[in-house]
Amino acid sequence: SAVAVGWSGYASGLLTGFGIDVPQMLPFGEMAGHALHFNPLAVFIIFAVAGLLILGTRESAWVNSALVVLKIAALILFLVIALPAFDISHFTPFAPFGWGSTPTETGVNTGVMAAAAVMFFAFYGFDAVSTAAEEAKNPGRDLAIGIIGSMVICTLLYMAVGAAAIGAMDFNAFAASGEPIAEIVRSLNQPEAAAIIGGVASIAIPTVILAFLYGQTRIFYV
C-alpha cells in the first residue's frame, strides 16, 4: 500500500501534465475524530498488478524485467542531469537534524536514526526473491545471486541518487514533493527529461507491488 501511494504521486503529476486532473485523495468519512481518505490511483494500480499476475508467471516475469530496465535507465538519466549541477554546500550542515530520532512539533521524527528506519523499509522485499525458488532451475545458485546481487546494485543506486538529489537541490525544496526526482530535474530546466522520468516512474514503480503480490501468492500456497 505504501508503494501504491508513492506511485500515485508520480501518476498524478504525469496526468496533470497532460491536463487530466485526478485527485490523489478523496474524502471517505471520519473515524475517531480523524478524516479518512481514499486514494483512487493507489487502488487502481494494485488491481492492475493483480490482474497481470493472474495472467501467469511467465508473462509477469517478462513485464517485470522490461520495467526494471526502464527504471534503471530513468535513474541513470537523472544522474546524468543532476551530477553536473552538484553543489557540495548543500551537504552543510551534514546532519541538520542530528544523529538521533527527534520528533518535531508536527509529530514527525527527524534525524539520522529516523531516516535509517525509513531506509530499512526501502530494503524490505529482497527476501521475496526466495519465494520464487519453485520456478528456479538451480535455486541454490540462482537465489543467492538474485538476492545478494540485487541488494548490492540497489544500494549503490540508492546512494548515488540520494547524493545527486541533495547535491543538485536543497533538500527542503523537494522534501514534501510527491515526485521528488522529477521535481529536481524540472528545477534544472529539463522539463522533457522530468516528464520522461515521471512517466517511467508511473510505469515502473509497480514492479515493487508485483514482487510483493507474487511473493504473497507463493506464501499462501505453501
Q: What role is predicted for each listed range?
A:
Residues 51-57, 134:
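Structural signal for the C-terminal ends of transmembrane alpha-helices
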Residues 1, 5, 63, 146, ...:
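Non-catalytic, surface-exposed connector residues within folded enzymatic/regulatory domains
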Residues 19-44, 69-198:
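Helix-loop-helix junctions that connect adjacent transmembrane segments
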Residues 63, 150, 203-206:
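Loop-to-transmembrane-helix entry motif
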Residues 1-46, 51, 202-222:
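Hydrophobic transmembrane alpha-helices that form the core helical bundles
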